[in-house]
């Protein structure tokens, strides 16, 4: 596959419109993450039944970001395209898929752990961003909604997760289990009715921190306990002790300790992470825009 550098007239800098392409039903799984940086990247959401059935424009001002997958038919067509990975690359299946896509595409990834695993300079990191309007709403919910439960668990269920939740219940902990039929305001208000949030990996090879689930609530100063992950020493949430990370077999004890002595993240630390992540986003946007703005004015052909 070939990527064409556009011709720049009189040295004019091209700042393209980025179109986020996904099957419409799939948006809900990563909408919060996308919304956190959509304004900075000027994202236009395009939800489709069939991603092949769309009028993709081969023009330097149009760049299409595909969520998680792209068809072979579209991969071979000539227009500017990027892939957004939202899966955990500790899972061999997804690692192999992304490794293959990197032969053809630049990739955006939400996770610094994924980036460490794949170890390829064509992967651009965009972490979950502190979005003022989103976090203000979550803070309001958490501060004002009465606490009916001790612990919130949000996500699909697995035997590995069920074991921890049942152990918590046997220790007298009142758990709110929020399944994936709950989204948006309904989900968030249920989480806010709990004192804290816990994060447990689905299975043993799911070994990347679930930032989509946890970061927004940590930003809202809700206490979070998370299972350790493969490269969690790279995580700002661990470095600044915003989230308490622990091994799987310590989740129950750590949660009980948190409930007896709740430790809230400070606004100063949250603001530090906010600033760092915005700088990372700014760098990522410059990296993306540089793909369509070569150092020379002549048309060039670059194999990617």
UniProtKB/Swiss-Prot annotation:
Superkingdom per UniProt: Viruses
Q: Which family does it belong to?
A: Belongs to the mimivirus L137 family.
Q: What is this protein called?
A: Uncharacterized protein L140
